[in-house]
């Protein structure tokens, strides 16, 4: 079997080498970056709860993301039939759910998860899609630190499908 040749991409964190099989195609791009279609997930550290959804073509475009179920065990999203078809979903185990994370400069205690725009990744088909949640039972943002306004579930809660981002 031939070994896959790594590609080198530029990021704000410096040069990164990734396998082409780790490239995720977003047919609609990401909100605000609709012209960017190819991304990959980069680990910041092995023990960190966050990943970077990094554009392959734009070194400046890297979004901090996290598995929402690590913080909020009962998080639920609605995915339309059309969105499932676009993602080529046959089974819920094919998908990882991610949300963007915001950390205000100098205020890590105000780290928040954006629950209104989850990002779904079919890790088998290497397809991604941001799925806005218009009518959800959750606020747009949830703080990850319990001392803030919204209390969240314990950090050791896990997504029930075991198909999370750790597969990357």
UniProtKB/Swiss-Prot annotation:
GO terms for cellular component: cytoplasm. It comes from the Bacteria. InterPro entries: Flagellar_assembly_factor_FliW, Flagellar_assmbl_FliW_dom_sf. Gene3D superfamilies: BH3618-like. Its main location: cytoplasm. GO terms for biological process: bacterial-type flagellum assembly; regulation of translation. It is found in: Cytoplasm. It holds the Pfam family FliW. Keywords: Bacterial flagellum biogenesis, Chaperone, Cytoplasm, Translation regulation. Belongs to the FliW family. Interacts with translational regulator CsrA and flagellin(s). Acts as an anti-CsrA protein, binds CsrA and prevents it from repressing translation of its target genes, one of which is flagellin. Binds to flagellin and participates in the assembly of the flagellum. NCBIfam families: PRK13285.1-1 (NF009793). This is Flagellar assembly factor FliW. It comes from Oleidesulfovibrio alaskensis (strain ATCC BAA-1058 / DSM 17464 / G20) (Desulfovibrio alaskensis). The gene is fliW.
């Amino acid at each position: 079997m031939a070994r896959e040749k790594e590609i080198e991409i530029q990021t704000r964190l410096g040069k990164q080498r990734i396998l082409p099989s780790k490239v995720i195609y977003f047919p609609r791009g990401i909100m605000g970056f609709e012209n960017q279609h190819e991304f990959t997930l980069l680990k910041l550290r092995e023990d960190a709860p966050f990943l970077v959804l990094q554009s392959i073509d734009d070194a400046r475009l890297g979004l901090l993301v996290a598995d929402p179920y690590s913080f909020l065990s009962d998080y639920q999203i609605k995915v339309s039939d059309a969105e499932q078809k676009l993602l080529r979903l046959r089974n819920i185990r094919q998908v990882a759910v991610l949300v963007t994370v915001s950390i205000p400069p100098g205020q890590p205690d105000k780290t928040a998860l954006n629950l209104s725009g989850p990002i779904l990744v079919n890790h088998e088909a290497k397809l991604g899609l941001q799925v806005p949640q218009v009518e959800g039972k959750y606020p747009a943002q949830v703080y990850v630190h319990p001392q803030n306004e919204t209390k969240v579930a314990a950090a050791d809660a896990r997504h029930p499908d075991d198909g999370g981002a750790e597969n990357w």
